[in-house]
């Protein structure tokens, strides 16, 4: 129940690749906490944006159960989804949304390491830089350079500990990017 933005770069966005067939038997769908009841009085009290310890509210789909009204708004809203400018409600809703980040951080995708685990030089990249990173490491290792690479498959939530640990072990760090503004660096 979180918006997803897929960040890519031009090379990946305009490329085609042949990949092995996905094993769909390994895919599971977790629909999360769903709200459904046959009791219409309970359904009338459904709160789409209920404040929870995880930040994730129980979901009900429109027309899923008799008597459930799914209400939401793009501006600040209360637990029932109605517009509000109440300061306490605003603070509670912001905190609720931020708690969702804790769950995301538990499932962070760890960077892929290429080359030596500990090296004098570390190359860091994301997106379409993976091929260039690996090629650079191979060339530099063949020339006798102590070098390794770290490729990030996601940049948020950022894998802080993994990247910081890799940087601490290196004497020199280069961030290799395929953009003009150094978005990662």
Predicted stretch roles:
Residues 2-185:
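Flexible, low-complexity linker and terminal segments
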């Amino acid at each position: 129940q979180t918006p997803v933005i897929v960040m890519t770069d031009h090379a990946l966005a305009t490329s085609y690749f042949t990949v092995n067939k996905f094993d769909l038997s390994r895919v599971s769908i977790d629909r999360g906490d769903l709200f459904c009841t046959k009791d219409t009085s309970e359904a009338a009290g459904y709160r789409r944006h209920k404040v929870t310890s995880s930040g994730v509210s129980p979901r009900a789909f429109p027309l899923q159960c008799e008597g459930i009204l799914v209400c939401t708004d793009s501006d600040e809203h209360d637990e029932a989804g109605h517009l509000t400018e109440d300061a306490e409600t605003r603070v509670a809703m912001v905190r609720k949304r931020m708690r969702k980040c804790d769950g995301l951080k538990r499932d962070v995708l760890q960077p892929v390491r290429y080359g030596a685990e500990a090296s004098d030089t570390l190359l860091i990249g994301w997106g379409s830089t993976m091929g260039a990173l690996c090629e650079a490491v191979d060339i530099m290792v063949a020339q006798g350079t102590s070098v390794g690479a770290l490729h990030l498959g996601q940049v948020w939530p950022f894998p802080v500990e993994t990247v910081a640990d890799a940087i601490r072990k290196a004497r020199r760090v280069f961030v290799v990017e395929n953009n003009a503004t150094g978005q990662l660096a």
